[in-house]
A protein has these predicted regions:
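Short, conserved catalytic-motif segment at the N-terminal edge
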Residues: 27-91, 113-115, 132-136, 273
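Alpha-helix C-terminal capping/helix-coil junction sites
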Residues: 50, 109-110, 191, 228
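Bacterial N-terminal signal peptides that target proteins for export
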Residues: 1-10
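Short, conserved phosphate/pyrophosphate- and ester-handling motifs at nucleotide-, phospho-/glycolipid
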Residues: 35, 98, 291
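Active-site SXXK
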Residues: 40-47, 60, 66, 91-120, ...
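N-terminal signal peptide c-region/cleavage motif recognized by signal peptidases
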Residues: 16-17
Length: 301
């Protein structure tokens, strides 16, 4: 399944850098060893994707040596209203929430709150007796075996915990992860469903970062969003990176599009509750909204 979002942080313009970029030092591309001509080609290539209907719009930035040398917004933030893309547009960054979670965790590690090889059951005892599906290809709650080894904190960071994906059929059936639940409830639900593999034996892209987010709350004694705001976003001056898009920011939120069978972009919502509504679930694996320049600051670390 392919989802089209207008965020192009992977390009971290020959266009002039406007007032929004004043928070970051700017420079001429050639002064940091880049090519103005080459960046102009980047603009042409991105515009070609917009013109072909592959994406609705894009905001692209290039930074080198801590200096912003390119910033370009192309296409539209919302096709239905024909709202143009802007440099300060906000995007649902989905799984790019995960590196923020890992950074917050490592800040707490530096302060001595935990060790990377600690079993997570030391802090979340509900995981102490978790078992493993006998056949992970056809998970059955009645067909399980004893687990070999414990989930370590490091397993959560490298996605080797054995936990499943929020979209796995058994997690959906068991109601493991719903945005109407609290993070503590989701973690409790995940602990009662068997693992898909023994910890540390297999890479699996699933709820690991969500569990890590709960550990951050346990270690810090704060909510996850408070830790993010105080320990990550404030020091980096990431003023537009949030879990909830308030009314003032909503006018800048880009619509997510997915191509239909004919390749036409259609609005698509992956979540049952939109980001413009406050929800109980704030998790480490998904959920942040950010701007290109905010995430460019994070990417400079």
């Amino acid at each position: 399944m392919r989802f089209i979002t207008p965020l192009a942080n992977a390009l971290l313009c020959l266009a002039s850098v406007g007032s929004i970029a004043q928070e970051l030092p700017t420079a001429n591309p050639e002064s940091v060893g880049l090519s103005s001509e080459g960046l102009a080609q980047v603009t042409q290539n991105l515009q070609a994707h917009v013109d072909a209907g592959h994406i609705a719009g894009v905001v692209a930035a290039v930074l080198k040596d801590g200096k912003l040398v390119y910033l370009e917004s192309l296409g539209q933030r919302d096709l239905e209203s024909a709202s143009p893309m802007s440099d300060d547009a906000l995007f649902r960054v989905y799984s790019m929430t995960r590196p923020v979670t890992s950074l917050a965790a490592m800040i707490l590690w530096e302060e001595g709150h935990f060790q990377l090889d600690d079993p997570i059951s030391k802090y979340l005892p509900e995981f102490a007796s978790q078992r493993v599906f006998s056949d992970p290809s056809t998970p059955d709650m009645a067909q399980t075996r004893a687990r070999v080894g414990d989930i370590k904190v490091a397993d959560l960071m490298r996605h080797t915990s054995g936990l499943g994906s929020r979209s796995s059929s058994i997690y959906v059936e068991q109601g493991v992860r719903l945005r109407s639940l609290t993070l503590e409830q989701v973690v409790s639900n995940a602990a009662r469903v068997p693992l898909f593999s023994d910890p540390g034996t297999r890479f699996g892209y699933g709820l690991s970062a969500t569990i890590l987010g709960r550990l951050i709350e346990v270690w810090s004694g704060q909510t996850l969003d408070s830790v993010f705001a105080e320990r990550v976003f404030a020091p980096l001056e990431m003023q537009d990176t949030v879990f909830y898009v308030d009314p003032e920011r909503q006018k800048r939120l880009a619509t997510v599009y997915r191509p239909d069978a004919d390749g036409q972009l259609r609005p698509h919502e992956m979540e049952d509750i939109p980001f413009t509504q406050q929800v109980p679930l704030l998790e480490g694996g998904v959920g942040l909204v950010s701007s290109t320049l905010d995430f460019a600051k994070f990417s400079q670390l």
